[in-house]
Regions:
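N-terminal Lys/Arg-rich, disordered targeting/topogenic segments
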Residues: 1-2
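Solvent-exposed, non-transmembrane regions of membrane-associated and secreted proteins
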Residues: 5-187
Length: 187
């Protein structure tokens, strides 16, 4: 009987440790996200009179992505490294900057623990508005397409003739065998 009780106690303790780890990761991600947003806001306030480029801050924050339809406001990191995507969405280096001619491409994770920024991206519809705030201003995009591709179909990141926005995330959430793509045009 004592062995069963000890085994049960060990299982409960292990479960609590796993749960505590998941909660702490989520809290840490929220803290890092707030720090990025605060740093970006400080940059905007200090550079309002002289702005040289969209990524003028010394921080890793390019701007802020807002999707009102899904109540999302998230910092945009300047790259798509594993570290950046833990705490924000990220801008694919080599693609257009927000508001510029070309294809501004941004990636974000969907998960059950941390980095849940694009969990509701599948709820975005054609005609919805997506906003990006940078040190150069606020840019509004209108969604014109949404589709799913294989992970190898990287042509969705190719340059475009117009100022467009491409949001990329894994789908479905649990197995992530494909990529959900949301395309939008600058208004």
């Amino acid at each position: 009987m004592k062995k069963k009780n000890a085994f049960g106690t060990i299982l409960i303790a292990a479960g609590l440790i796993i749960l505590a780890g998941a909660v702490s990761m989520k809290l840490w991600a929220a803290y890092k996200q707030k720090a990025m947003l605060d740093a970006f806001q400080t940059t905007i306030q200090t550079t309002e009179t002289s702005v040289t480029d969209a990524g003028s801050s010394d921080q890793n924050t390019l701007g802020v992505l807002e999707i009102p339809k899904i109540d999302l406001t998230v910092a945009i990191g300047k790259d798509v490294t594993k570290e950046t995507l833990k705490y924000s969405v990220g801008h694919f280096e080599g693609t257009a900057l927000p508001g510029e001619k070309g294809n501004c491409s941004i990636a974000g994770h969907r998960s059950y623990t941390y980095s849940q920024f694009f969990n509701r991206l599948d709820e975005v519809s054609i005609g919805d508005i997506i906003k990006i705030k940078t040190s150069k201003g606020t840019f509004s995009y209108v969604v014109y397409d949404k589709f799913i591709v294989e992970p190898s179909h990287v042509e969705v990141l190719n340059p475009s003739a117009d100022a467009t926005l491409t949001l990329v995330t894994c789908t479905p959430i649990r197995v992530a065998t494909h990529r959900l793509i949301v395309k939008a045009r600058l208004q």
